[in-house]
Amino acid sequence: PLCRAAVAGGKLVCRWHGLAIGAHGVPGWEPLPAHDDGVLAWVRLDSVGGEEALPMPVLPRRPDPEISLDAVYTGIGRCEPEDVVANRLDPWHGSWFHPYSFVGLRVVEEPSEDVDRFVVEVAFRITKRIGVPVRAAFSCPEPRTVVMDILEGEGAGSIVETHAVPLGVDDSDHPRTAVIEATIASSPRPGFAVARRGASLMRPAMRWAAARLWRDDLAYAQRRYELRSSGRWPG
């Protein structure tokens, strides 16, 4: 696959055929606008989106890459992007669906005309009796992205970006949506610098933690889609 191709002289070189594709493409191959933000790679599909094209993705404030650690999780569900976004914007779902990870959740700020965000206080479980309290804000920089920003507590300044990407429909004509979630962690603690040096070990652990949560959250999103599409969604 071309995703594993080499880059030489500004051209993408297929490792199998030796085909070299430059910035203007070749017959049968058309380049697409792309953007690498340092954590995620984006491709702009103008003919698919049906929306006004932007010069680059809408990104939130991120921690300094020199002192942060990132990991990306990808999952796919039978639902639409709005179901994924609804899951992330349900401020109470953390305690309801993930009691093994969160405890003592309290909504302290709701969206208003001036500030369009939720703010919650919650503790991340370490053991049954020990948790790490934080204050976190949830907001949407664009319609298919939800950002959790740690405002206070352990890891303040860290963020979790959740992007809901439509993938078309499956063989049964049901929509498929990819959840692409980037966790970008930062901490002033001396031990975090050690963790960054062990990034090759930390990233799989961070992806595992995200996958554990999304096992439940995708079930939520898929159930929501099932109720909506069958006319059983309340209201």
For the regions a protein language model found, what residue spans apply to each?
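Rieske [2Fe-2S] iron-sulfur-binding domain
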Residues: 1-59
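C-terminal catalytic domain of Rieske-type non-heme iron oxygenases
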Residues: 56-235
